[in-house]
Amino acid sequence: MSRRRRAKKRIICPDSIYDSRLINMLVNRVMKDGKKSLAYKIVYQTMDQIAEKTEQDPIQILEEAVRNTKPLVEVKARRVGGSAYQVPLEVNPERGTVLALQWVLAAARNRSGRSAIAKLTNELIDASKKTGGAIKKRDDVHRMAEANKAFAKFRF
């Protein structure tokens, strides 16, 4: 067991242009090596491209993409008697949002093409339409949890 105190939850401030916490969460995950202004530029240009392509509010597209990608259950490894079981657990909403953003970004980075903006734009639009790599990842996690339903009795 850890002897430290439990870390306090950080309050995520909404961004200045769209006044959305989700945008700020996305920016913090797009950011590499502390280059936050570059991350803001990528995310804002992505939002502009989404608005151009879909002719809808980009915040609604982002929220829809995250809502479609959020997992309901996940599996965690638990050692019981020398063997590790994949135990299915329900995901709390905050962690679901974080996982959805991580999966959307990972799927966008795995896409072919040069521009990070174009890849992220296409992945968010696909996720809002319930297609794309992030949705596939969510379905894989759900399938894994369904397959290991028998080990639900070993909950944490």
UniProtKB/Swiss-Prot annotation:
Domain of life: Eukaryota
Gene3D superfamilies (UniProt xref): Ribosomal protein S7 domain (1.10.455.10)
Disulphide bridges: none
Cellular component terms (Gene Ontology): chloroplast; small ribosomal subunit
InterPro entries: Ribosomal_uS7, Ribosomal_uS7_bac/org-type, Ribosomal_uS7_CS, Ribosomal_uS7_dom, Ribosomal_uS7_dom_sf
Signal peptide per UniProt: none
Locations listed in the record: Plastid, Chloroplast
Pfam name, any one: Ribosomal_S7
GO biological process: translation
Single GO term (MF): rRNA binding
Assembly and binders: Part of the 30S ribosomal subunit.
Protein family according to the UniProt entry: Belongs to the universal ribosomal protein uS7 family.
Function according to Swiss-Prot or TrEMBL: One of the primary rRNA binding proteins, it binds directly to 16S rRNA where it nucleates assembly of the head domain of the 30S subunit.
NCBIfam families for the chain: rpsG_bact
Name the record gives this protein: Small ribosomal subunit protein uS7c
UniProt organism field: Tupiella akineta
